[in-house]
Amino acid sequence: MNLVMLILALWAPVAGSMPELSLTLFDEPPPLVETEPLPPLSDVSEYRVEYSEARCVLRSGGRLEALWTLRGNLSVPTPTPRVYYQTLEGYADRVPTPVEDVSESLVAKRYWLRDYRVPQRTKLVLFYFSPCHQCQTYYVECEPRCLVPWVPLWSSLEDIERLLFEDRRLMAYYALTIKSAQYTLMMVAVIQVFWGLYVKGWLHRHFPWMFSDQW
């Protein structure tokens, strides 16, 4: 294209029938604009986490309850931590419920999460936190375990399924036996009440000879 424009520019004065063309082979680069330097980052080397611990359990109905403890040189205020849960299939999601700060000192921070329903196949609970707003993010993980009492009268079938998922088969079979005995006694009690209120009175009215003294 540049070669064609060059031929036309040289031929135009001779022919006298074409206007003059301005020939620009290269555009000049724009001038450099000086920008203000970025402010220096603050020194955050003094903030660090020296110890972290996580405890989490699953109560009846798949309700997650977790407690995290952090120790170290932490900023005031501390950034809000984030909590995620991961299932066996690899699916992860953030817990929208904010954790509760139950700290008693500035050196040790304690965060508590309670009564949040998670899937029964939850494998890990991840807790992300930072000692300051510009510090590196740390995380600690814990594997929730189903909390079932020794007399699991109020445990559900979902809790037994969770015990099998955790490979705690002995506890799962024990809970299933207790629940079966509980349901059996409840059915016997219902049958006795139904017999005393309805069946026995109906028999008295229609078959009085069944309750005579001759029998």
Curated annotation (Swiss-Prot):
Cystines in this chain: 56-142
Subunit (UniProt): Interacts with host TRAM1.
Upper lineage: Viruses, Duplodnaviria, Heunggongvirae, Peploviricota, Herviviricetes
Regions that span the bilayer: 183-203
UniProt keywords, alphabetically: Disulfide bond, Early protein, Glycoprotein, Host endoplasmic reticulum, Host membrane, Host-virus interaction, Immunoglobulin domain, Inhibition of host adaptive immune response by virus, Inhibition of host MHC class I molecule presentation by virus, Late protein, Membrane, Signal, Transmembrane, Transmembrane helix, Viral immunoevasion
Record's protein name: Unique short US11 glycoprotein
Modification note: N-glycosylated.
Glycosylation sites per record: 73
Pfam assignment, any one: CMV_US
Source species: Human cytomegalovirus (strain AD169)
Residue span, Ig-like H-type domain: 47-146
Cellular component per GO, a single term: membrane
Signal sequence, start to end: 1-17
Domain of life: Viruses
Membrane topology designation: Single-pass type I membrane protein
Principal location listed in the UniProt entry: host cell
